[in-house]
Amino acid sequence: MKPARRRLLRLAAGMAALPALMRIAGAQSYPSRPVHIVVGLPPGLTPDIGARLIAQSLSQRLGQQFIVDNRPGGASNLATELVVRAAPDGYTLLLAVAGNAIEAPIYTNLNFDFLRDIVAVASIGRTPFVMVVPPSLPAHTVPEFIAYAKANPGKINFASPGSGSANHVFVELFRLKTGVELVHVPYRSSMLPDLLAGRIQLLFAAIPGVLADIRAGKLRALAVTTTTRVEALPDVLAMREFVPGYEASGWLGIGAPKGTPDGNVKTLNQQIGAVVADPAVKARLVGLGIVPIAMTPTEFAKFMAGEVDKWAKVVKFAGIKPE
């Protein structure tokens, strides 16, 4: 073979290998500039605070800024679409939350598909809810509540911040599993005054928002919505102990646009796993009502798919439509 031809073949082989080498180099140097975490909720809510805690820790660990970018609107769909349309390079991430899985079967005419277009990167944790009633309601346990509700169909009102919210669909899952008839009352302001006064008889709430009233005896906790008891309410039983197959919780994690390099996903997953395992970070997450749970990208993807499937059944059962 002539020397010129050999040089040409070596050059061609080198060029063919260039994309793979660039991907490897990119993964090794990631992140090399600031990373944005898009949050589809206003500042100050629990998921936003959790995202800022993770962002701060990642900034310290990786030597690049992780910036929380709040983009509320259209449920969480505005933020999700922004990330879907971003360059799939690991520099625009999504704070994926339970609302994404709940909204997926409600908003069916969007320009994206949550499971198809968002890559699961890392789980941060789950937020247990608690079933609470006012002391005036003659039910001290979940079986007593179910019996009372069936004896008084349509006479128990439950509150939520709106149709399709976690507080709403968690109760609808309870209805689906138990067959009780309850009346949904959506609120645009605080639900607690009416609940404390007994004008609303039921609320499924994130634990931090009602913990003080439970401890003061102003509200009665009947069950937590996770499969096991939680540290904040050790004497409150898990719903599954009364209602087989019931499990519902808020959750949050990190997603990225489809096509994000595997190396960048792996780096983020490992670093976020280390962050949520850090005792100081873990304590702060628990203080927010978030139970830290790390997963591999594959495990988190399977979890998200299961959540979408579960809430699709509940949305259909309850006839929930876009507002």
What do the PLM-derived regions correspond to, one by one?
Residues 7-27:
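N-terminal export signals
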Residues 85-90, 105-190, 239, 251-284:
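Hinge/capping helix and adjacent helix->loop/strand transition within the periplasmic-binding protein
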Residues 26-115, 155, 180-201, 294, ...:
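N-terminal (or domain-start) structured segment
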Residues 24-37, 87-91, 146-156, 215-216, ...:
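Immediate post-signal peptide segment of exported/extracytoplasmic ligand-binding proteins
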Residues 126, 209-278, 306-309:
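C-terminal lobe and pocket-closing loops
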Residues 12, 29, 34, 70, ...:
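Conserved functional loop/turn residues at catalytic and ligand-binding sites
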Residues 32-34, 177-180, 262-323:
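An extracytoplasmic/periplasmic, membrane-proximal ligand-sensing/linker region
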Residues 155-236:
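Ligand-binding pocket segment of bilobal, Venus flytrap-like solute-binding proteins
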